[in-house]
């Protein structure tokens, strides 16, 4: 089956997770999707999401596939941005205030809320540890979130100070962007006080 061999090549070229839209875009019929499952080439994680056999499920990709407006934040953002050496025990996501996530696993996922106007503020796309594209906040937004909501960030005082100190010693960080974000997030005063301690 020449076509089937090409389809398997298509699957091999994809990252660990494959969505039903990936198959549709490639004009692959459901007959072949079912055959891939029968042949133990892929398995169905949930409706519309498949993972290649012998690969680990990408929990980060699965979360964002299920909750489209969720953006990784706080400790999880620090992890994606290589600002921490420890893989967080909890996954932090930020969602719009009105977004319904009643079915989410709250023992594994810590939920933070923001306004609909600010949900995309500082959002960027990076690769998960499994090679899939996921959305997370940049370092500037993450620092603002941690400073504004220090009691909800999952960091103790020593960890928080270390993160902030390392962030402001990073030459690539945009300090003017932090101020701009702080104004939008209503934490400008706290951010300026922090910057006075760690920069000047």
Give names to the regions the model predicted.
Residues 1-16:
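Short amphipathic alpha-helical interface segments
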Residues 14-26:
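Short acidic, hydrophobic short linear motifs in intrinsically disordered regions
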Residues 20-22, 37, 45, 49-200:
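Nucleic-acid-binding surface
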Residues 25-38:
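Short amphipathic alpha-helical interaction segments
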């Amino acid at each position: 089956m020449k076509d089937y061999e090409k389809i398997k090549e298509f699957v091999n070229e994809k990252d660990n997770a494959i969505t039903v839209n990936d198959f549709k875009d490639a004009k692959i019929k459901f007959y072949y999707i079912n055959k891939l499952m029968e042949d133990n080439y892929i398995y169905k994680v949930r409706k519309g999401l498949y993972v290649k056999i012998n690969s680990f499920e990408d929990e980060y990709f699965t979360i964002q596939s299920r909750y489209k407006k969720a953006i990784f934040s706080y400790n999880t953002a620090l992890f994606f941005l290589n600002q921490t050496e420890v893989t967080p025990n909890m996954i932090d996501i930020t969602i719009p205030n009105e977004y319904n996530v009643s079915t989410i696993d709250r023992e594994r996922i810590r939920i933070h809320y923001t306004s609909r106007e600010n949900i995309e503020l500082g959002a960027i796309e990076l690769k998960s540890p499994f090679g899939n594209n996921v959305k997370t906040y940049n370092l500037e937004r993450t620092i603002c979130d941690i400073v504004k909501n220090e009691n909800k960030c999952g960091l103790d005082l020593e960890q928080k100070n270390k993160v902030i100190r390392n962030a402001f010693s990073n030459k690539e960080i945009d300090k003017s962007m932090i101020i701009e974000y702080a104004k939008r997030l209503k934490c400008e005063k706290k951010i300026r006080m922090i910057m006075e301690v760690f920069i000047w």
